[in-house]
Amino acid sequence: MPQVTKTNNENEFRLTRSKVQHQESISTIKNTTISNSQHKQQTQQQISSPPQVSVTSSEGVSHVNTRQYLGDVSNQYITNAKPTNKRKPLGGDNAPLQKQQHRPSRPIPIASDNNNNGSTSSSSNSSNNNNNDANRLASLAVPSRLPQKRQATESSTNLVEKLRVPQPEVGERSQSYHKKSRLIDYEWQDLDEEDSDDQLMVSEYVNEIFSYYYELETRMLPDPQYLFKQTLLKPRMRSILVDWLVEMHLKFKLLPESLFLAVNVMDRFMSVEVVQIDKLQLLATAALFTAAKYEEVFSPSVKNYAYFTDGSYTPEEVVQAEKYMLTILNFDLNYPNPMNFLRRISKADDYDVQSRTLGKYLLEITIVDYKFIGMRPSLCCASAMYLARLILGKLPVWNGNLIHYSGGYRISDMRECIELMFQYLIAPIEHDEFFKKYAMRKFMRASTLCRNWAKKFQASGRDLFDERLSTHRLTLEDDDEEEEIVVAEAEE
């Protein structure tokens, strides 16, 4: 009988586990299989004496790599880590950050239909005290980390009265509503009218959809100060972690929406939970695994994610971490993705490919750099589009259509975010994998182009927010003024 060969589908994407090889501990999977007891002994040996990391070049010569990888950061701080249990696969204490944010609210009395106006019968003091204690325990608020259970009501009329939300006064508008309540002092065109025949563009509902996004984005933001509240986590560790996450996202060829959602889920989780240093890689893997299932049509298997971690975690551990992470976040993944705002503002830019490609690179800066944590995605998209048009030399850089389709952002609103992006471009390269990704030809070598432009712009001493380059109209008021600006830029 002919022999049937079985194919191993563990590595469907033909991934290489890592460019970095540990000479002492990591061996080829095809030749050796390590038992659980031996794996624990080798892990303890790696903690006591971390192996040297070397990179083998194409010529066969090994060089010592000075780059600080994720495993090096874990080994450096692993002495402070505590053993984890099954209930907390990502480690950490008893959620001290969560106890600070989620305090039990005051008990809310539930109205009943029997209003006897003081005609109830008197009872003993002990029975009243017992009933009061029972009511207090029943009315305590459930922490938001757990799925909320539906409470029964005695009457449907009371439920309708409770669900009635009073309309806010004119002076009590929320912060997310301020862009819509401004006086429209700029010119803009209705570009959605062109898509009235296309049912996929839903032009009749697009304004309502993005109004909902603007209100939702403030609720889905992580705590901007969580890195400084964590006892072991440092900003440098998050930078290495997100850079590794970008590399895994590129290997799997996932959508940009999956990367943005994964970083948002990871930041929101660490805003309320303390994560051990040796579990950071597991958290990032579980976050991308969850985001891919939410955004992608065909998501990679969990075995591929576990394989990419270089055998550090098993598929069962990734699934267990995913369950725990979603429980803490109350299964809330309704995150207004920044790519939606970027596509919306690209309509006012005539869907220019160059502007949108540079905008995607500048937008991903906001997730790899910790300084942008807590900024609204719509603000980051508007700032990325402004800087992309400035790099390409488009005039006017910001006009009435861009103000309207960005959500009402003026240059004064974007000043802080644009300056942070510019400071990242002129600073030394910190995220290697992120820089290599956008140095490819299919991304128009955006990382190299933007950095070279930033250095020349800084040397020229020009102003990022030159009022002559922007207008509240559709075009610059005077054509001669536009020609003068172009000639001045050419001379510089």
Swiss-Prot record:
Mutant phenotype after disruption: Impairs macrophage killing during infection.
Keywords associated with the record: Cell cycle, Cell division, Cyclin, Mitosis
Low complexity bias: start-end ranges: 34-58, 111-135
Pfam families tied to this protein: Cyclin_C, Cyclin_N
Originating gene: CLB2
InterPro entries assigned: Cyclin, Cyclin-like_dom, Cyclin-like_sf, Cyclin_A/B-like, Cyclin_C-dom, Cyclin_N, Cyclins_cyclin-box
Phylogenetic lineage: Eukaryota, Fungi, Dikarya, Ascomycota, Saccharomycotina
GO molecular function: cyclin-dependent protein serine/threonine kinase activator activity; cyclin-dependent protein serine/threonine kinase regulator activity
PANTHER family: CYCLINS (PTHR10177)
Function recorded in the entry: 2/mitotic-specific cyclin essential for the control of the cell cycle at the G2/M (mitosis) transition. G2/M cyclins accumulate steadily during G2 and are abruptly destroyed at mitosis. Degradation is necessary for the cell to exit from mitosis. Plays a role in morphogenesis by negatively regulating polarized growth. Through binding to CDC28 regulates cytokinesis, partly by phosphorylation of the actomyosin ring component IQG1. Also involved in the phosphorylation of CDC6 and CDC54.
Family as reported in the entry's similarity comment: Belongs to the cyclin family. Cyclin AB subfamily.
Region (Disordered) location: 1-176
Name listed for the protein in its UniProt record: G2/mitotic-specific cyclin CLB2
GO cellular component, one term: nucleolar peripheral inclusion body
Domain Cyclin N-terminal span(s) in chain numbering: 208-334
Biased composition (Polar residues): 23-33, 59-83
GO biological process assignments: cell division; filamentous growth; G1/S transition of mitotic cell cycle; meiotic nuclear division; negative regulation of ascospore formation; positive regulation of G2/M transition of mitotic cell cycle; positive regulation of mitotic sister chromatid biorientation; regulation of mitotic cell cycle
Induction pattern: Expressed from S phase through G2 and M phases and are degraded at the end of mitosis. Expression is down-regulated by the anti-fungal agent plagiochin E (PLE).
Origin: domain of life: Eukaryota
